[in-house]
From Swiss-Prot:
Localization, UniProt: Cytoplasm, Cytoskeleton
CDD domains per the UniProt record, alphabetical: ASKHA_NBD_actin
Name of the molecule in the record: Actin-93
Entry GO MF terms: ATP binding; hydrolase activity
Gene3D superfamilies tied to this protein: 3.30.420.40, Actin, Chain A, domain 4
PANTHER family, per database record: ACTIN (PTHR11937)
Role description: Actins are highly conserved proteins that are involved in various types of cell motility and are ubiquitously expressed in all eukaryotic cells. Essential component of cell cytoskeleton; plays an important role in cytoplasmic streaming, cell shape determination, cell division, organelle movement and extension growth.
PROSITE patterns hit by this protein: ACTINS_1, ACTINS_ACT_LIKE
Length: 336
């Protein structure tokens, strides 16, 4: 969250609401009935954590209100009734959800004006394009969204319920095979950090596995909060490989490369060339080193042989949805 015209968000925190497991555990600590974001994260040992956004769609409005309240009053320190608001939504956001968001902004927060933009479209704007296909992959959901002259093509949008959280879960599982144990919500956050710091995508998965068997060059160590040091090797690339092979976690779905290709194939034949040449990655789950090269290799194998394929991975892509929103909201034409 932040202000239109800024080049980076002022506040970045996980959309988590935590409630104390037992009342009275923290007597005299001025215990709150709910904690949001980083504070919920840091006190997770005594809290039950809830994620009000599931697969990119809000599923718990009371908790979502808490998150928005925290954003306005504690993070940005603004009076919401004094600022127009731009919110973003995942592409297949049900109409009822958009209406509910609008209602809460006007009735609970008294916003003077609001607009809801599609996340992937904002990422494309942030990359300086108006035509292209965006693969947007966050924590709970991934989408491929073809966009032509600034408009998302709804019939060709595909959703993949495979994203960061699933990769973290998979890493927890394969680290267990190594004899480490991670099970609680608190431990999941540690594994997420391991994933973000050490995982990468292999250009050739089978070959990488062979290399891992014979050499220890890819082994890295990671110090846990309690001081214990764990070693992670092939897990580093086995974890995000799931994006290309969802069957590894028992999902009957096409990988991100094939989903992108399928999305392009749902578009008019005349615009496919523009889409193949402008494949834009966005969201935290596209931050793995090696993802652009692998994506390019896989799509080249699927596309017509003469087709020019370009995969763009902007360095700021973790926040490109926000940056696109900042650009859009600061245009004078938009404000009218």
């Amino acid at each position: 969250a932040g202000f239109a015209g800024d080049d980076a968000p002022r506040a970045v925190f996980p959309s988590i609401v935590g409630r104390p497991r037992r009342t009275g555990v923290m007597v005299g600590m001025g215990q709150k009935d709910a904690y949001v974001g980083d504070e919920a994260q840091s006190k997770r040992g005594i809290l039950t954590l809830k994620y009000p956004i599931e697969h990119g769609i809000v599923s718990n409005w009371d908790d979502m209100k808490k998150i928005w309240h925290h954003t306005f009053y504690n993070e940005l320190r603004v009076a919401p009734e004094e600022h127009p608001v731009l919110l973003t939504e995942a592409p297949p956001n049900p109409k009822a959800n958009r209406e509910k968001m609008t209602q809460i902004m006007f009735e609970t927060f008294n916003a003077p004006a609001m607009y809801v933009a599609i996340q992937a479209v904002l990422s494309l704007y942030a990359s300086g394009r108006t035509t292209g296909i965006v693969l947007d992959s966050g924590d709970g959901v991934s989408h491929t969204v073809p966009i032509y002259e600034g408009y998302a093509l709804p019939h060709a949008i595909l959703r993949l319920d495979l994203a960061g959280r699933d990769l973290t879960d998979h890493l927890m599982k394969i680290l267990t095979e190594r004899g480490y144990s991670f099970t609680t919500t608190a431990e999941r956050e540690i594994v997420r950090d391991v994933k973000e710091k050490l995982a990468y995508i292999a250009l050739d998965y089978e070959q990488e596995l062979e290399t891992a068997k014979t050499s220890s060059s890819m082994e890295k160590s990671y110090e846990l909060p309690d001081g214990q040091v764990i070693t992670i090797g092939a897990e580093r690339f086995r974890c995000p490989e799931v994006l290309f092979q969802p069957s590894m976690i028992g999902m009957e779905a096409a990988g991100i490369h094939e989903t992108t290709y399928n999305s392009i194939m749902k578009c008019d034949v005349d615009i496919r060339k523009d889409l193949y040449g402008n494949i834009v990655l966005s969201g935290g789950t596209t931050m793995f080193p090696g993802i652009a090269d692998r994506m390019s290799k896989e799509i080249t194998a699927l596309a017509p042989s003469s087709m020019k394929i370009k995969v763009v991975a902007p360095p700021e892509r973790k926040y490109s949805v926000w940056i696109g929103g900042s650009i859009l909201a600061s245009l004078s034409t938009f404000q009218q």
